[in-house]
Amino acid sequence: MKILAAMSGGVDSAVAAARAVEAGHEVVGVHLALSRMPGTLRTGSRGCCTLEDSMDARRVCSQLGIPFFVWDFSERFKEDVVDDFVSEYEAGRTPNPCMRCNEKIKFAALLERALALGFDAVVTGHYARVITTEDGNRELHRAADWAKDQSYVLGVLTHEQLKHAWFPLADTPSKAQVRAEAAERGFSVAKKPDSYDICFIPEGDTRAWLGDHITMRPGLIKDTHGEVLGEHPGAQAYTVGQRKGLALGRPAADGKPRFVLEVRPKENEVIVGSRELLAVHEIRGIRATWAGVPVEQAARFLEEPAQLGARSEEFEVTAQVRAHADPVRAKAYMTWAPDPEAEEEGALRLETVVRLLDPLSGVAPGQTMVLYQGTRVLGQSTIARAYSLDREDIQDTLSAGASTSAD
């Protein structure tokens, strides 16, 4: 096959490309330039998307004896990832830019160009498995090494994209083995540290970066009863579950720390409360995509006409709302609900409702909820609302924040 290897400049993509070459494929390496001013992206041992990374990727391709190119995706990255990140925070939501990058850049823009140029598949260094079923369908599964599993951030991929995705590290037992293999091959990136932070925030200080990109207005910090506890420099700088940086005027009556429960951009308010009030028992997600063929209950429901209140049969899942969080057992169903974002009266939106058998803490609107059955990724949706048995539901910031959003 003709393979395009996405070269990040790290050890994982280097070994993935090497395995593709050894498998006998025609491999071409490409590094994505995501900024026209690389100095504005993180530099150093924990970064990604830097000039150093580009040079590391070039050296690996030279050692493998394969062609190497740099593709300028900076404008697309700014529009689809950076601008989206800003507008989501403006609306009081907590986005995941790495998932947006996978969805819009690595497995949309990159794959589209690769297919147009005659490539059969794109190879990356992600830790996840793609399985072809007996009936020819493609499924996304967790990697063999659950400690490094990245199926969560790949939950945005569609069935069509999975047809052209290859993850050679899928069955590698550990990251240590990948590094050992890289060292044996003489790759200089064998000991290069992993990158963890957001690549376009140079110093890793999200609040300071947002302050340079969003107009912040001072406002009030309140408890769940509406009592004013303090002031904040801008509601958009806070996220659900946050404890640090609240600067409250006095301690809680019970002496326990307080956490952000809600961000209300329309009112420019931050609502705080005890850790116990962060517990969420039901989540509603929108903009669902399926990583393969939808489960039977959802597939049947999606064939029926949209009708307010209609719902599918329940199906058992495990739900994960953060990249490295433990999944929790749940029951899910699809339903048609009023669309608060639509201008047309009576418009409906499709929602994924997940009832958690064990509560989750600190679920924020805007986060991605990925559903699994066993090791298989069913799909994902963007969290619109979360409900707690202990307090009123977190308001739907996908509509409440619309007046301040740049969408």
Residue ranges of each PLM-predicted region?
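ATP-dependent adenylation/nucleotidyltransferase module used to activate substrates
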Residues: M1-G155, K175-Q177, V260, D393-T404
